[in-house]
């Protein structure tokens, strides 16, 4: 016999994150950690604050429903950026850091992002000339 699972109504990943954050007894408990040296740890509270702060900045620069191109390696800041984009009411367009120039050109021309978030100067250099056009 199948049991019905009772699930609280969560509308999206942002709500799920903040609900989990509320339920944390120790907000300083480590949530995310980078793998590269020097290692950086992010507590639930730091992550929450970073998401809110970046989201507020994104809202100043964009309109609800705009696309945001996110070019980053798999790292804690990717998670923070993605949830910030969603919280700001934007659409995340994720891109691999290993794409060729023509791939970035296609994505940028196709999605027409209002803003681009990159993980470092190396990633920025890959797309800056495309963005100028």
Map each language-model feature to its residues.
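Short, flexible active-site loop motifs that bind/organize anionic cofactors or intermediates
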Residues: 37, 44, 94, 113, ...
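Residue-level recognition of oxygen-bearing side chains
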Residues: 46, 53, 77, 112, ...
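Proline- and acidic/polar-enriched loop/turn elements at helix boundaries
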Residues: 33, 69, 97, 118-120
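Active-site-adjacent beta-strand anchor residues
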Residues: 7, 71-72, 117
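N-lobe entry segment of adenylate-forming
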Residues: 1-61, 66, 83, 109
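Conserved ATP-dependent adenylate/AMP-binding module captured primarily in the ANL superfamily
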Residues: 99-130
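Alpha-helical structural signal in soluble globular domains
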Residues: 84-88, 126-133
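Conserved AMP-binding/adenylate-forming
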Residues: 40-41, 55-101
